[in-house]
């Protein structure tokens, strides 16, 4: 079939297999150009391995460090009538590239929150890897089923205390308008912590430890975004912020429970980037469009793969890791410089519908959004018929 983007609100409901493959290849090429990682991990488990920062982590570990990688994800396969999800095509492309490069790589498709998928991962590690020395936790999900009680929790994106009315870039209408987000109640906060906090990360590490598949001196990191004043009302001082704070609690718990292995656990603070998750968050499309304008003008903007390659080389495996005042590995320091934030604020205050293209890089934002789904990739002929069915090799049933 000929595949063109179908956009509904802030999501794209289809994906292009060839475009996704090219996008993955671009990231692989970037990592290779940076040279080999020093002190690289050997056996890596990536929980949330198919898109965004998780995919970039898998690519960096494999093609920057020669690591064996086991990827966990929850994606949809294509059929003859309907495309698969971008993450499915990304993983198919990653697996093909890993095979070509002679890199060990296996894949598990299913609910990472479940006990069943944890057990599958453990069985695979025992059979093929022995132990893992890096565990990346990069899940973004709107809901979670508690594996022990069966209760389903849904996350919300709401401020805490008072409702917030703020400027917003309505991406479907291409307009600047105002959005009011109602304040969260305690259930909203608790449920969001359940879905997006550190409990499942902790459960993964506990399960891996009990199964004796964690290497001595292993490292694990979960990813977070910690913005400044502009994004605080919806992101920091909000339900999602409380969930991210719970990652700090989990970090301490993981360090304590794995102290006999000298385990290292970190939360890594990363750039605001265009992902399927961030495009759903009110204010983020406008904030990122302004951020693009400022940081691209300075030549300092880093996308997903640039951030992760630098996180690995400078922080996770670097000689002098950089920490923020909260003790997180601090990779988005360029974004949070006062000068950058002041210029973003100036754009924010001034921009209206008529000046979107002049004052922000919304075009860049929109292009980056399309690229997530394999569209707008240079060198891909979108008039060509393509097969939406793309099998993933080395999938564990």
From Swiss-Prot:
It catalyses: a 2,3-saturated acyl-[ACP] + NAD(+) = a (2E)-enoyl-[ACP] + NADH + H(+). Coiled coil: none annotated. The record marks 75 as: Plays an important role in discriminating NADH against NADPH. Substrate binds at residue 225. Keywords: Fatty acid biosynthesis, Fatty acid metabolism, Lipid biosynthesis, Lipid metabolism, NAD, Oxidoreductase. GO terms for biological process: fatty acid biosynthetic process. One of its GO terms (molecular function) is NAD binding. Involved in the final reduction of the elongation cycle of fatty acid synthesis (FAS II). Catalyzes the reduction of a carbon-carbon double bond in an enoyl moiety that is covalently linked to an acyl carrier protein (ACP). This is Enoyl-[acyl-carrier-protein] reductase [NADH]. It comes from Pseudoalteromonas translucida (strain TAC 125). The lineage of its organism: Bacteria, Pseudomonadati, Pseudomonadota, Gammaproteobacteria, Alteromonadales.
């Amino acid at each position: 079939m000929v595949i063109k983007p179908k956009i509904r609100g802030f999501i794209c409901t289809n994906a292009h297999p060839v475009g996704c493959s090219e996008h993955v290849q671009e990231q692989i090429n970037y990592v290779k150009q940076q040279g080999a990682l020093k002190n690289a991990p050997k056996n890596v488990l990536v929980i949330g391995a198919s898109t965004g920062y998780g995919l970039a982590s898998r690519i960096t570990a494999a093609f920057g460090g020669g690591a064996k990688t086991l990827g966990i994800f929850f994606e949809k396969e294509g059929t003859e009538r309907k495309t698969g999800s971008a993450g499915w095509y990304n993983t198919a492309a990653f697996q093909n590239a890993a095979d070509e490069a002679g890199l060990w790589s296996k894949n598990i498709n299913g609910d990472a929150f479940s006990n069943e998928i944890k057990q599958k991962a453990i069985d695979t590690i025992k059979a093929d890897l022995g132990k893992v020395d890096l565990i990346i936790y990069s899940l973004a999900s709107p809901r979670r089923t508690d594996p022990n009680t069966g209760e389903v929790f849904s996350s919300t994106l709401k401020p805490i205390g008072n409702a917030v009315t703020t400027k917003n870039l309505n991406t479907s209408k291409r307009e600047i308008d105002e959005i009011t987000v109602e304040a969260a109640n305690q259930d909203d906060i608790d449920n969001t912590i359940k879905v997006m906090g550190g409990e499942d990360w902790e459960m993964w590490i506990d399960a891996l430890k009990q199964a004796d598949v964690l290497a001595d001196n292993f490292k694990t990191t979960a990813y977070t975004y910690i913005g400044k004043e502009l994004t605080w009302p919806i992101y920091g001082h909000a339900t999602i912020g409380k969930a991210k704070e719970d990652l700090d609690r989990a970090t301490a718990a993981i360090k304590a429970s794995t102290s006999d292995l000298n385990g290292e656990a970190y939360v890594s603070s990363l750039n605001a980037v265009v992902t399927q998750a961030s495009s759903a968050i009110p204010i983020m499309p406008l904030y990122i469009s302004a951020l693009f304008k400022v940081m691209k003008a300075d030549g300092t903007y880093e996308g997903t793969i640039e951030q992760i390659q630098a996180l690995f080389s400078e922080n996770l495996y670097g000689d002098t890791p950089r920490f923020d005042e909260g003790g997180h590995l601090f990779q988005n320091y360029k974004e949070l410089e006062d000068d950058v934030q002041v210029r973003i604020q100036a754009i924010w205050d001034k921009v209206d519908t008529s000046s979107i293209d002049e004052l922000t890089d919304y075009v860049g934002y929109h292009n980056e959004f399309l690229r997530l789904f394999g569209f707008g990739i240079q060198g891909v002929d979108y008039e060509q018929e393509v097969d939406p069915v793309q099998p993933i090799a080395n999938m564990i049933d």
